């Protein structure tokens, strides 16, 4: 059997393969990873790499004892928007709830007005800046939702901007677009049934026909969409080949998780108000539970998703930033990992697996989120030697080198390089 001809090798590493289940990061100390082109060609012991891999012509990175993981998969983001909601943040700091602000004319309505008024170039530039901040922290795959246009023409415009974002990043990250039904447009609040009917008959088929999205997501919540409305939208999307997902049980127990199980959604995200029946439904249907602890922190709540109960019930979990202007205005990967441990009670290994393999599962991307022969060569070298350190040293960017499809797309300055041995 011929040796793989490596184009990139990371040596002297602690490799986390993230392919051994939800609670095992698959740590391999004293290890190396060899990449051939866009794929992982070999993973094994450092002492074997020279005998088993052709290193002639390969770019070699000495990890110096640092942790090498799969590229992070941020499976839930809202990067395309304009404007700010800092004033709303101050109101919530003074005691108003998210729902109270929304019902008084704030919330999504504010972002919708600003986003509709912004030109494409402004929206693209802002989204690209947010994506670049995530890439610099080890994210190599991003799900990006529409949702702030609300009506059909604006939602189509936002999805086209998401596609432009992928091109603007030049292959430095994979962008997976989602059509999000966030709320009924203000122009159609008097005819909710008509809006849903038109979306099923026109918007969703056009999105599918033009291949503008891979997923369709619905916010199932008081003031957004009822389960019966969401069922119609998601079934129409599923019939057209889009993968259904839901925002579920974030602010109230609205039945979104059971709907996700019924429809075979790839994920049900948020879940702060999830009950035992919802957990059982997700477990039986093998729907991924999307954990978004930055949102809970940002909204000033102490009611986090029941992550431990989900894991104990056998529900697969993912971890994501939920970067958005209303409930998680942050791209901080390190803080997300730390909150997963401190508030969701995940172990550091579980948090890392959820942010890699879990995200890949939520997005139905089997070649992502793991370090294994044949998998996509999306890798991160961190300036520490363990998942525990990543979560312990809070809100810090530990990413030293980020690799996408076998190509270094981000590298920290030399002064940031550390020896972890």
From Swiss-Prot:
Zn(2+) binds at residues 76, 78, 247. Catalyzes the hydrolytic cleavage of the carbon-nitrogen bond in imidazolone-5-propanoate to yield N-formimidoyl-L-glutamate. It is the third step in the universal histidine degradation pathway. It catalyses: 4-imidazolone-5-propanoate + H2O = N-formimidoyl-L-glutamate. This is Imidazolonepropionase. N-formimidoyl-L-glutamate binds at residues 148, 324, 326. Fe(3+) binds at residues 76, 78, 247. Binds 1 zinc or iron ion per subunit. Pathway: Amino-acid degradation; L-histidine degradation into L-glutamate; N-formimidoyl-L-glutamate from L-histidine: step 3/3. InterPro entries: Amidohydro-rel, HutI, Metal-dep_hydrolase_composite, Metal_Hydrolase. It is found in: Cytoplasm. Its cofactor is Zn(2+); Fe(3+). It is an enzyme of class 3 (hydrolase). One of its GO terms (cellular component) is cytoplasm.
């Amino acid at each position: 059997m011929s040796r793989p001809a490596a184009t990139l090798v990371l040596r002297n590493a602690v490799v986390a393969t993230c392919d051994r289940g939800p609670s095992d990061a698959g740590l391999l100390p004293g290890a190396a990873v060899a990449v051939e082109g866009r794929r992982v060609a070999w993973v094994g012991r450092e002492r074997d790499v020279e005998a088993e891999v052709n290193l002639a012509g390969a770019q070699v990175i000495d990890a110096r004892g640092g942790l090498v993981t799969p590229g992070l998969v941020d499976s839930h983001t809202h990067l395309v928007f304009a404007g700010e909601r800092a004033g709303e943040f101050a109101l919530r700091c003074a005691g108003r709830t998210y729902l109270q602000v929304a019902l008084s004319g704030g919330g999504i309505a504010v972002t919708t007005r600003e986003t509709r008024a912004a030109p494409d170039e402004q929206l693209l530039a802002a989204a690209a800046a947010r994506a670049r901040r995530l890439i610099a922290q080890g994210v190599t795959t991003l799900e990006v939702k529409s949702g702030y246009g609300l009506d059909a023409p604006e939602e189509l415009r936002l999805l086209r901007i998401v596609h432009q974002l992928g091109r603007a990043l030049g292959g430095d990250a994979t962008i997976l677009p989602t059509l999000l039904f966030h709320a009924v447009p203000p122009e159609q609040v008097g005819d909710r049934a008509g809006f849903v009917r038109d979306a099923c008959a026109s918007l969703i088929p056009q999105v599918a026909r033009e291949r503008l999205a891979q997923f369709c997501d619905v916010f199932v919540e008081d003031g957004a969409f009822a389960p019966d409305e969401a069922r119609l939208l998601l079934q129409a999307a599923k019939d057209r080949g889009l993968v259904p997902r839901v925002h579920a049980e974030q602010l109230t127990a609205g039945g979104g998780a059971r709907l996700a199980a019924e429809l075979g959604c790839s994920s049900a995200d948020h879940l702060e108000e999830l009950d035992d029946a919802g957990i059982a439904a997700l477990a039986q249907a093998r729907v991924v539970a999307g954990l978004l602890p930055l949102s809970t922190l940002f909204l000033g709540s102490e009611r986090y998703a029941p992550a431990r109960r989900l894991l104990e019930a056998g529900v697969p979990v993912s971890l994501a930033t939920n970067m958005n202007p209303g409930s998680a205005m942050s791209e901080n990967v390190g803080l997300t990992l730390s909150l997963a441990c401190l508030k969701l009670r995940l172990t550091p290994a579980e948090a890392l697996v959820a942010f890699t393999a879990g995200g890949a599962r939520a997005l139905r991307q089997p070649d992502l989120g793991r370090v294994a022969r044949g998998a996509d060569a999306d890798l991160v070298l961190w300036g520490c030697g363990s998942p525990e350190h990543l979560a312990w040293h809070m809100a810090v960017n530990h990413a030293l080198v980020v690799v996408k499809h076998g190509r270094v797309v981000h590298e920290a300055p030399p002064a940031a390089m550390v020896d972890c041995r």
